[in-house]
Structure formats: structure tokens, C-alpha cells
Amino acid sequence: MVKVFKCPECGSVVEVREENIITPLSTKRIKVLLCPYPQIGVRNHIYQHIVRIKYYGEWEDPKNFLISGKEGLHEVILGTRDEVAFYILRAELWRNGGPIVDGAYLSKHTRAKILWKDKRAIGYYSEFTHTKVPTMAEIYVRPQYRGNGYATEMIRDFLNSHKGPVAFYFIHRKCMRNLLLKVGAIEKGGEGYIFKRQIELLSWQQDPIIFWENDKYK
């Protein structure tokens, strides 16, 4: 008899069949059951809802992985429940209209930290470690927790983790400027910005008129 689960989003009955299962994590022992009916999220992002996660033999509600006894920022370890949580959060980022950076999944070239508060996953940030300088790839705060300074907390943790120059792979330039202003990495000065922390701009960030509005380096 085929096991079935109800999709919590569209209400469809989803059968546990090979065509509905993917293994996108570091071990094939962790399986993801997807609803076969695509949905359209924010900014027309097409996605499939995560119905269940099979974690080492047991099918679990995805929400279970976003609950933990941890507190604060913790690095994600491959093959653990935190890796599943990271996968779920990235899927949520896409569903909510956020950009997914190519190659920012967990690997030997990418590390990530999840922020936990009151036993709940608040969000995460990831960084590339194989680039010229440490580069923040993605940062995400879940909608229900925004406005509490959590993005600032994660930016500050990233900066404090590296003594030398860093870079930020931000699609939304205004968002990047605002966050760096909040943590004191840059400050407004005259017609542009003064760098208080050594930050390298990526190739597509180089145009000062588009990005920094006539930046001034200290």
C-alpha cells in the first residue's frame, strides 16, 4: 500500500512515489517529498511545496526541522537536522521572492549559519569560502521575524568572523548599503560613502554611479 500525505498548502493528496521524491542534500538517506503541483510565489517564482522530509528512516513534518534547542547563530553541519533546516529556509527564501545565489548550497566551498531564537529558526546567512576574499552569498530573515535587527546581527557576525577584506553578493544594492550602514561598516560622507571596513566590490558592483553614488574610501 502506497503511503500518502496531504499537502499543507494546496490540500492535494501526495503519494510517496519515486517521481515525487528528490535527494538534494549531502546524503541520500535524507529524502524530500514534494507536492507534484507547482505553485507561484512572490515575483512569479515557481516552486513545489515541501510536504515531508524523510530523515534517516522517518517521514517528518518540515516544520519540525525549524525547531531546535539551540540559541544564537550556529554553523550548519552536513548530514544533520540543521542541514535540512537550511534547505527548507532556502526554499522559503525563493518562495517569498528572494534571489537564490547560484552555488550557495552547502558544499566544501560554502558554509552557512542559522540564527535560532526561542527555539525557532529565524533565518540564515551563507558565505563562499573559495573566492578571493570571504563573500557573503545569501542572507535571509523569515517574514514573521523581520524588523527586530536579526539581519544586522548576522551581518555583524560575518564581519567579526573575518579580520581582512570581505565581499557581499547582494542583488539589492540599496539593501546592502542600509545593512552596512547599520553595522558601521560604511558611513555617509559628503556626496558618497566612507568605508570604515575593507570591503571589496564584485565586478558588477564597480560602477560608483549605480552602486555607491561616488564612493569615498577612507
Task: State each model region's role.
Residues 1-133, 160-218:
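Terminal substrate-recognition subdomain of acyl/acetyltransferases
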Residues 132-143:
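Conserved acetyl-CoA binding element of GNAT-fold acetyltransferases
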Residues 141, 146-160:
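Conserved acetyl-CoA-binding loop-helix of GNAT-fold acetyltransferases
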